[in-house]
Amino acid sequence: MRRTERLFAILQILRARTGAVTAEQLASELEVSVRTIYRDIEALQLAGVPLYGEPAS
């Protein structure tokens, strides 16, 4: 899966779910590392996508 496809997939997953979604869940579903998810989230935020999160407790 290319990065653009993965970014779109992340957005679709986040919109479809009503509760919290962890980076670990996204990584597992998209078959990438957690670090890749963090980089992708950062790219989406830099592109102006309003994403908000909290550190896991």
Regions found by a protein language model. Name each.
Residues M1-S57:
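Short, basic/aromatic recognition patches that contact phosphate-bearing ligands
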